[in-house]
């Protein structure tokens, strides 16, 4: 049995477009590769993201969708252990809220491919609260693969479950120049010993 997906659900398209509009005006970073893995150049997302653009775009998206307008960006900040020692990381946090049963998983998976199409972003990590949800996302990636390939002109993408003991998997994520989707649980993300935190 094969599932048929409707690519034209208006409320889903509005959610995808809302996320994509956050990055309007951001440019491809002009600098070369930022880091290396074992002497090999890694391929980062290359979008120059300015906080003033993000805030202006966020306000426009909120106004368009009848959402109370934020006066400032909200951030997640924490200390993490890296190969260069303890570092504080800080990044903007955005939320897309949808009712249960409206296709949230479909929307955020399609949003990843839309961000690739519009802005050339390649690296995506999906962090979920449980193993059951992780398995559901991996299953959804499998059953939507043909549908997404038709929508995005056979754009190649690779998805998999993060496994901390699989160093080659993390290496592929870093070095690949195609869309990479890594799915992991919050517990595996929070372990200090994980390769992803180094």
What are these regions (language model features)?
Residues 1-198:
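RecA-like P-loop NTPase motor core of helicase/translocase proteins
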């Amino acid at each position: 049995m094969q599932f048929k997906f409707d690519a034209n659900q208006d409320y889903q398209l509005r959610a995808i477009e809302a996320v994509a509009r956050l990055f309007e005006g951001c440019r491809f970073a002009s600098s070369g590769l930022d880091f290396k893995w074992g002497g090999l150049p890694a391929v980062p997302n290359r979008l120059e993201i300015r906080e003033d653009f993000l805030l202006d775009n966020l306000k426009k998206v909120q106004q368009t969708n009848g959402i109370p307008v934020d006066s400032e960006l909200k951030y997640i900040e924490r200390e993490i252990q890296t190969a260069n020692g303890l570092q504080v990381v800080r990044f903007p946090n955005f939320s897309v809220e949808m009712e249960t049963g409206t296709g949230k998983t479909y929307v955020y998976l399609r949003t990843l491919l839309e961000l690739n199409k519009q802005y050339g972003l390649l690296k995506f990590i999906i962090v979920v609260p449980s193993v059951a949800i992780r398995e559901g996302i991996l299953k959804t990636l499998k059953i939507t693969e043909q549908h997404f390939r038709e929508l995005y002109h056979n754009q190649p993408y690779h998805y998999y479950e993060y496994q901390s003991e699989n160093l080659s998997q993390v290496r592929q994520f870093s070095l690949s120049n195609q869309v990479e989707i890594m799915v992991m649980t919050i517990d595996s993300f929070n372990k200090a010993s994980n390769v992803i935190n180094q």
